Amino acid sequence: MTSPKKTTTLKILGFLILSLSTIAASHHIPTSDIALGKKIYHERCEVCHGNLGDGKTFAANVLFPPPKNFTSKSIKTELSLKKMVRSVTKGRPNTAMMPWETVLSKQEILSVVNYIQQKFMSSQK
């Protein structure tokens, strides 16, 4: 027979394991979200930020400041998820980055930001 103390400990341990697995799962980006982000990026962002995410486009020659280079070495420390979502949602003052909050849903904005981070920023050294 199991003691009440051991039973309580096992229940708490089980709860913690379930909680941690739920937290870990919430940080996983479903494939469909990445696919949606890719679609949005190529339709709406690529013209300024480029196919490679480096901002080397015709737009870079005519916009000041030039579009953000998502492949630069300093970009990971410069751009957090929160800052990127805010920039896409509200736009960036004194730049050509327009607000997308009336065009894209919150889920679409998060999908495109996740795509940018995964595609262009995750391989930074």
Which residue stretches match the model-derived regions?
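Extracytoplasmic electron-transfer domains, predominantly the class I c-type cytochrome c fold
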Residues: 63-118
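Electrostatic cytochrome c docking/interface patches
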Residues: 22-40
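Inter-heme linker and motif-flanking segments adjacent to c-type heme-binding CXXCH motifs
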Residues: 54, 118-125
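Short cysteine/histidine-rich zinc-coordinating motifs and their immediately flanking basic loops
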Residues: 58-62
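Bacterial N-terminal signal peptides that target proteins for export
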Residues: 2-13
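Bacterial N-terminal signal peptides
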Residues: 11-21
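The canonical Cys-X-X-Cys-His
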Residues: 37, 41-51, 112-116
